[in-house]
């Protein structure tokens, strides 16, 4: 792996130290000012793999920088997210559970080699639409081809970026694919969208909520404490409601209290699990 002999970092927010402020995988913005809060390289929780020997902005084209700026502007406006995606730093990811990794898009076949060799990834769940892949100039065919060569199952469940209603509608099928891959037990599942800050965390939180005996807040806090991000909790609540109350006489979700379906009864969880598993292969 010629390019994968690159820098990688492992970190969590819990042990953040001032002397490591210059090592960055994400940038968060303080409410009052544009403080550049950097995440350190030497902590457990999040692993960020850089695709170049010297990641940074020096070798980034103006076109690429404009794309990142436009994308991060849209993310702030539509998701009210203080986080930023830096495509030029390469693929980054976080081990959420032993069987589950959440991250940004693989950018080249060498990233697939890295996931296989370093993280024992056996399944990749891609939540991007075709237009997302085209926007970032990713050669998906080469990535899928490398997955096949390495025996990695590549799955797609597209959802529209920055769109809670799209995420809500696609969550059941996406979680169905994720839960199936986990149940196969052949290796870790890598769930990604473009930045790994919205759709991929949302699907992973829904999976933990519906299948790991957690309420929504516990599942949400578990993920964001390891990977700082801003997935839409309302989309997960809405999808939970859609699955648990699948009847024509149900009251509109919009009329329910703000915290509705942040927890479910055991019988509702079993019903949701049955309905999600029934979506396998659809």
Swiss-Prot record:
Predominant location: plastid
Give residue ranges for domain Tyrosine-protein phosphatase: 92-249
This entry's Enzyme Commission designation comes to: 3.1.3.-
What is known to happen upon mutating residue 155 to A? Decreases starch C3 dephosphorylation. No effect on phosphatase activity with p-nitrophenyl phosphate
UniProt transit peptide range: 1-61
Which InterPro entries is this protein grouped with? DSP_laforin-like, Dual-sp_phosphatase_cat-dom, Prot-tyrosine_phosphatase-like, Starch-Glucan_Phosphatase, Tyr_Pase_dom, TYR_PHOSPHATASE_DUAL_dom
Q: Where is the signal peptide?
A: none
This protein's GO CC annotations: chloroplast
What tissues express this gene product? Widely expressed.
- Report a single Gene Ontology molecular function: sugar-phosphatase activity
Could you say what a knockout of this gene produces? Answer: No visible phenotype under normal growth conditions, but starch of mutant plants contains high levels of C3-bound phosphate.
Which PROSITE patterns does this chain map to?
A: TYR_PHOSPHATASE_2 (PS50056), TYR_PHOSPHATASE_DUAL (PS50054)
Q: Which GO terms describe its biological process?
A: starch catabolic process
Top-level EC class, please? hydrolase
Q: Where is the active site?
A: 193 (phosphocysteine intermediate)
Induction of synthesis: Expressed with a circadian rhythm showing a peak at the end of the day and then decreasing to reach the lowest levels at the end of the night.
Task: Name the residue ranges of motif: Glucan phosphatase signature motif CXAGXGR.
Answer: 193-199
Q: Which compartment or compartments is the protein found in?
A: Plastid, Chloroplast
Q: Where does substrate bind?
A: 83, 153-156, 161, 177-180, 194-199, 230, 245, 251, 259-263, 268
What does the UniProt entry list as the effect of changing residue 157 to A?
A: Decreases starch binding and starch C3 dephosphorylation. Moderate decrease of phosphatase activity with soluble substrates. Nearly abolishes activity with water-insoluble starch
Arranged from A to Z, the UniProt key words for this protein are: Carbohydrate metabolism, Chloroplast, Hydrolase, Plastid, Protein phosphatase, Transit peptide
Q: Report any Pfam family annotated for this entry.
A: DSPc
Matching PANTHER family: DUAL SPECIFICITY PHOSPHATASE, SUBGROUP, CATALYTIC DOMAIN, PHOSPHOGLUCAN PHOSPHATASE LSF2, CHLOROPLASTIC
Summarizing the function annotation, the protein's role is: Starch-associated phosphoglucan phosphatase that selectively dephosphorylates the glucan C3 position. Probably participates in the regulation of starch degradation.
Question: What name is this protein filed under?
Answer: Phosphoglucan phosphatase LSF2, chloroplastic
UniProt source species = Arabidopsis thaliana (Mouse-ear cress)
């Amino acid at each position: 792996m010629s390019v994968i002999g690159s820098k990688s970092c492992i970190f969590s927010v819990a042990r953040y130290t001032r002397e490591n402020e210059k090592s960055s995988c994400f940038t968060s913005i303080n409410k009052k000012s544009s403080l550049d809060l950097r995440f350190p390289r030497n902590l457990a929780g999040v692993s960020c793999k850089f695709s170049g020997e010297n990641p940074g902005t020096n070798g980034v084209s103006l076109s690429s920088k404009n794309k990142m700026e436009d994308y991060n502007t849209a993310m702030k406006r539509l998701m009210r997210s203080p986080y930023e995606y830096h495509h030029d730093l390469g693929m980054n990811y976080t081990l959420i559970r032993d069987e589950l990794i959440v991250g940004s898009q693989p950018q080249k076949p060498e990233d697939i080699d890295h996931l296989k060799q370093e993280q024992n990834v056996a399944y990749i769940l891609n939540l991007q639409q075709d237009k997302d892949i085209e926007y970032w100039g990713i050669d998906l065919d080469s990535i899928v081809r490398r997955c096949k060569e390495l025996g990695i199952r590549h799955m797609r469940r597209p959802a529209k970026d920055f769109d809670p209603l799209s995420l809500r509608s696609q969550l059941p099928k996406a979680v169905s694919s994720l839960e199936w891959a986990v149940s196969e037990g052949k290796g870790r599942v890598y769930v990604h969208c473009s930045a790994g800050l919205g759709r991929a965390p949302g699907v992973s939180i829904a999976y933990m909520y519906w299948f790991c005996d957690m309420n929504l807040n516990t599942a949400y806090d578990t993920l964001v404490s390891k990977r700082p991000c801003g997935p839409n909790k309302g989309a997960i609540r809405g999808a939970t409601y859609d699955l648990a109350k699948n009847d024509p006489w149900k009251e509109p979700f919009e009329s329910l209290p703000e915290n509705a379906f942040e927890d479910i009864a055991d019988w509702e969880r079993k019903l949701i699990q049955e309905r999600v598993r029934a979506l396998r292969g659809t």
